[in-house]
């Protein structure tokens, strides 16, 4: 069992994961940090009985008061970067599902984590199914010369493309070079062919009713292969989060992506 502070507690992911951890986990949630609903009892925010713990907006003060072992972060990159560094500098391990960090920010977090010999996991996706999709895509990439990625999310997601799509493109580009188009393409509407990551096109869809979905489509001579993963509920992330919470206590270094620990 670990003592955990939830960062970004009042967001959709923060609320869903907090409720599941409170109901189905041996871990103890000792603090809740967010910039909204400050001063309110977190149990009432979740629609359950009062917890006797209110939402606070200063992570360092919460750490000093509650002495946690892990900060679990589902906030936004704009604030998460500073707060992750605060946690590590105060000798608290971090598991983060926040996306949208720059490469420079990730490198800084890695440096601070390693310098303090503290486990820190930043994972673009905690869904075991999504991680398996990426693994299968790596296998398929050895046999197909063309690939594109389509990711679908709810219309309130602020960053595009998703961290999972970027991670997938990174994995694919590390083992193969995407073949350029056989023709000179002309975009009648700029951006209509999607974003480009090292020759791999990524397309982002944002619509109400969606949660999180991704397709990796491979094309070859006379055939295509489509790999798809769908998340219908944020509960799908719980198994991966529990796995990360266990593993981060064993780590003394930075890890990006659960795939390094799973496979």
UniProtKB/Swiss-Prot annotation:
One Pfam family in the UniProt entry: DapB_N
BP GO terms, sorted: diaminopimelate biosynthetic process; lysine biosynthetic process via diaminopimelate
Biochemical pathway: Amino-acid biosynthesis; L-lysine biosynthesis via DAP pathway; (S)-tetrahydrodipicolinate from L-aspartate: step 4/4
Enzyme Commission number(s) from the entry: 1.17.1.8
CDD domains per record: DHDPR_N
Active-site feature positions: 153 (proton donor/acceptor), 157 (proton donor)
Function (record text): Catalyzes the conversion of 4-hydroxy-tetrahydrodipicolinate (HTPA) to tetrahydrodipicolinate.
Family recorded in the similarity comment: Belongs to the DapB family.
Protein's recorded name: 4-hydroxy-tetrahydrodipicolinate reductase
Source organism (scientific name): Carboxydothermus hydrogenoformans (strain ATCC BAA-161 / DSM 6008 / Z-2901)
The gene coding this protein: dapB
